[in-house]
Amino acid sequence: FRMKGLPMEYDKETIKGSTNGYGLGVKFELTNGQVWEQTSSDDEYLHQFMPEVLLDTAGNIGKLKINDMNDWVEIKRIL
């Protein structure tokens, strides 16, 4: 994974429907058909409808950050 603060290119996607933010086991369904599940225990609530997300992934694991949220969370791809 990349270091914070460095200018990097991330994949930009959009969550399908609404989300309430982060929590262990939360599933993020993207408009591109992919589904990712949060594997870290970070907990942050922010209800949003179809927010943009940044993805930093390698294969079926990586990190995700929802627009307007503070942190990146660890994820695994389940679909």
Q: Can you name each region flagged by the protein language model?
A:
Residues V35-W36, D71:
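Short, isolated positions in well-ordered beta-strands
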Residues Q38-T39, I75:
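Short capping micro-motif at the N-terminus of alpha-helices
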Residues S41-D56:
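Short nucleic-acid-contacting surface segments enriched for D/E, G, S/T with interspersed K/R
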Residues N60-D68:
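Short, Lys/Arg- and Gly-enriched loop/turn segments at beta-strand edges
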Residues N67-L79:
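Short peripheral tails and domain-boundary helices/loops at the edges of structured domains
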